[in-house]
């Protein structure tokens, strides 16, 4: 039985389509994510004391919380940034058939 707190969204950004596609392929092939949505974004941030803005790709990664550390490790190993954005957002609740599909589509650690 799953609970609504078993799932999370991982957010990451990358600078180009090639790195985006590497990360997506790596996560999906390892069954560390059930679904990854992408969209172009404009990021504004401070880096090494300078105000910067860049066009990036946002990755919205749907997975299970128990897989987060593996997801983080996979992204870190494939990512081109010196400091990659990799953050976890818990899914508090969701449509049960979707959450069940998410569970069935990802790596089982049991």
Predicted regions and their residues:
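Positively charged, small/polar-rich N-terminal and surface patches that mediate targeting and assembly
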Residues: 1-110
């Amino acid at each position: 039985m799953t609970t609504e707190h078993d799932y999370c969204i991982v957010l990451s950004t990358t600078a180009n389509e090639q790195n985006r596609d590497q990360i997506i392929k790596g996560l999906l092939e390892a069954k560390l994510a059930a679904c990854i949505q992408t969209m172009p974004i404009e990021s504004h941030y401070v880096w090494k004391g300078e105000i910067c803005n860049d066009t990036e790709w946002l990755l919205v990664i749907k997975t299970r919380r128990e897989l987060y550390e593996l997801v983080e490790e996979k992204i870190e190993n494939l990512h081109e940034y010196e400091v990659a954005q990799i953050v976890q957002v818990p899914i508090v609740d969701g449509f049960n058939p979707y959450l069940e599909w998410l569970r069935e589509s990802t790596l089982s650690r049991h």
